[in-house]
Amino acid sequence: MKILLIHCHYRLPGGEDAVFAAERALLEQHGHTVVVYERSNEEAAHGAAKALLPFRAVWNRRAARDVRNIMEQQHIDAVHIHNTLLLLSPAVVRAAKKCGVPVVLTLHNFRLFCPNGILLRDGRVCEDCPHHGLHCALRHRCYRGSRAQTLVVVAAYWLHRVLGTWRGIAITTPTEFDREKLLEFNKIHPTFDENRLVVKPNPVTVPTGPVTLWEERKRQFVFAGRLEELKGLRTVIEAWRILGRDAPLLLVAGDGPLADWAKAQNLPKVQFVGQLPRDALHRLMAESRAVVAAS
């Protein structure tokens, strides 16, 4: 098959980008021809593009036109869409639907019903928007702490809910928990076809090569991921502060909004290695005692 993959990268690399890359590789390994349409929110970080972003996040005509042209010229058999926020907009979903081929959308979060996507606010579970409406996010500035930016996200998802953008397509989500929550929210605010929502776990790349025995590994732990509250980095740093000189070496791989705070703690047993390529990260994990997962 010839498959079109569509994805908008965030300004900071994250898990969605990794899944997108892994699925692309998996499809190609199994003999499919993969055509990629990808953009990055970094493109709209400055100048006129930044000024136009609030409008394009709701409906990006150019992106929709690009998708239609690719599908017509490349004779695409199926479309798999990942993230559309902010630069692509859900308009690319509508464009793909109009071309008459199967369309699959992977939901990596709960953004159809929750503007910040994670059902958390101030460190606690929050389901105000799924139960009472997207407008609740405006009161709490749920997207990046900005009422203006939250308004853009609310407008985009409200409009495309009304237009039925997510109906008539297959939707995948990585876990059964996600599926159950999405079905619960969809009964309150009908947004997609419930019978077309399925669980598709994220692919896992299994490292190959020699295995280092545990007793031969270095006395170090690895924290890998976006450096933000959601991933539990603050908790990990505080734990290493308490352990003090008795702590093993902690290698922090990644970048994000908490990077400056974490580095400012100046803990002797914590080192920051930045954003690593997947192979380098796997090698680092292979020679370490354990991986810290705190989210």
Residue spans for each PLM region:
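A short, charged, and often flexible helix/loop element on the N-terminal side
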Residues: 39-69, 81-83, 140-152
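A conserved nucleotide-sugar
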Residues: 224-225, 233-271, 279-280
